[in-house]
UniProtKB/Swiss-Prot annotation:
GO cellular component entries: cytosol; nucleus
Phenotype on disruption: Embryonic development of mutant mice is normal until 13.5 dpc. At this stage, the normal expansion of pancreatic beta cells does not occur. At 18.5 dpc, the numbers of beta cells is dramatically decreased and the pancreatic insulin content is only 2% of wild-type. No effect on the production of other pancreatic hormones, including glucagon, somatostatin and pancreatic polypeptide (PP).
UniProt comment concerning the protein's domains: The C-terminal domain contributes to sequence-specific DNA-binding.
Keyword terms of this UniProt record: Developmental protein, DNA-binding, Homeobox, Methylation, Nucleus
GO biological process: one example: type B pancreatic cell differentiation
SMART domains in the record: HOX
UniProt name for this protein: Homeobox protein Nkx-6.1
Source taxonomy: Eukaryota, Metazoa, Chordata, Craniata, Vertebrata
InterPro entries linked to this entry: HD (IPR001356), HD_metazoa (IPR020479), Homeobox_CS (IPR017970), Homeobox_NK-like (IPR050394), Homeodomain-like_sf (IPR009057), HTH_motif (IPR000047)
Region of interest (Disordered), residue spans: 35-136, 295-365
Length: 365
């Protein structure tokens, strides 16, 4: 039963000593009262002989004639004076013993408090029980101070935790998401292979952006960074018209022939396919519609003028045809007196000229 209890003691200390504050409190309790006080015989009041002290400190097993009712090894004199720590076999059973916790580098105060345990066996055997109690209380105070320092500082509590941030690559710069060229340069610097050759990785950018069509290079000529807003000689802001490539204008004209107005999604799709902004496509269509209206109005005016002139010409020919019909109709002297009178008045001048020519011809003859 005692052996089982001796094995359960390190297990309890292993669970209780998982955190530094609990370890310090448990060490204080163990320093004041040993784990199994009934198993150890009382120490003699007088100083023991040098032979017995040397034999007890050097031999790992108790002597044959010693009085040990439980069959356990009595603690060494140095173990009692070293901060009231448990025996060596109990602390060696688990890596979470009090000596291991106090000797950790993250708690310098506790490691300094464990220095009295390194005292030689001769001096520890000559000390009395009152001296061991005084050293135990001092060690308890040092352990409590170390626990308070560890609990107050977050670095002491988190010192033993692994840092997984060192495994991940550094975060990308902000310009990586706004400039494809900068993203490509950053990708070459961060990774040994290009992004397209990495297995199982989807491309970061759209394929149309990474491998652009021929007219996408003209985006550089349309960007406002090239000076859509310049300064005049007087220092005033001067707006310049952006220039488009022939392929862009050809695609815009073909789209304009199909439809004169674009909806929002159609404008966005056309702008992306041509490497232009939506505002540029919108302004181009507005200007193109204005030009088309002017041209259409001019064509309509020309067609109207041509139609009017043709109507007048047709009207004149119809009147002449009516006159010819009147002349070609036969006359009835009994019923067409009014018609004969109108024809004579209309052609009086022409008839007079004919009579004049006839009289001149007769006189010359």
């Amino acid at each position: 039963m005692l052996a089982v209890g001796a094995m359960e003691g390190p297990r309890q200390s292993a669970f209780l000593l998982s955190s530094p504050p609990l370890a310090a409190l448990h060490s204080m309790a163990e320093m004041k009262t040993p784990l199994y006080p009934a198993a150890y015989p009382p120490l003699p009041t007088g100083p023991p002989s040098s032979s017995s002290s040397s034999s007890s400190s050097s031999s790992p097993s108790p002597p044959l004639g010693s009085h040990n009712p439980g069959g356990l090894k009595p603690p060494a004199a140095g173990g009692l004076s070293s901060l009231g720590s448990p025996p060596q076999q109990l602390s060696a059973a688990t890596p979470h013993g009090i000596n291991d916790i106090l000797s950790r580098p993250s708690m310098p105060v506790a490691s300094g408090a464990a220095l009295p345990s390194a005292s030689p066996s001769g001096s520890s055997s000559s000390s009395s029980s009152s001296a061991s109690a005084t050293s135990a209380s001092a060690a308890a105070a040092a352990a409590a101070a170390a626990a308070a320092a560890a609990a107050s500082s977050p670095a002491g509590l988190l010192a033993g935790l692994p840092r997984f941030s060192s495994l991940s690559p550094p975060p990308p710069p902000p310009g990586l998401y706004f400039s494809p060229s900068a993203a490509a340069v950053a990708a070459v610097g961060r990774y040994p292979k290009p992004l397209a050759e990495l297995p199982g990785r989807t491309p970061i950018f759209w394929p149309g952006v990474m491998q652009s069509p021929p007219w996408r290079d003209a985006r550089l000529a349309c960007t406002p960074h090239q000076g859509s807003i310049l300064l005049d000689k007087d220092g005033k802001r001067k707006h310049t018209r952006p220039t488009f490539s022939g392929q862009q204008i050809f695609a815009l004209e073909k789209t304009f022939e199909q439809t004169k107005y674009l909806a929002g999604p159609e404008r966005a799709r056309l702008a992306y396919s041509l490497g232009m902004t939506e505002s540029q496509v919108k302004v181009w269509f507005q200007n193109r519609r204005t030009k088309w209206r002017k041209k259409h109005a001019a064509e309509m005016a020309t067609a109207k003028k041509k139609q009017d002139s043709e109507t007048e010409r047709l009207k004149g020919t119809s009147e002449n045809e009516e006159d010819d019909d009147d002349y070609n109709k036969p006359l009835d002297p009994n019923s067409d007196d009014e018609k004969i009178t109108q024809l004579l008045k209309k052609h009086k001048s022409s008839g007079g000229s004919l009579l004049l020519h006839a009289s001149e011809a007769e006189g010359s003859s």
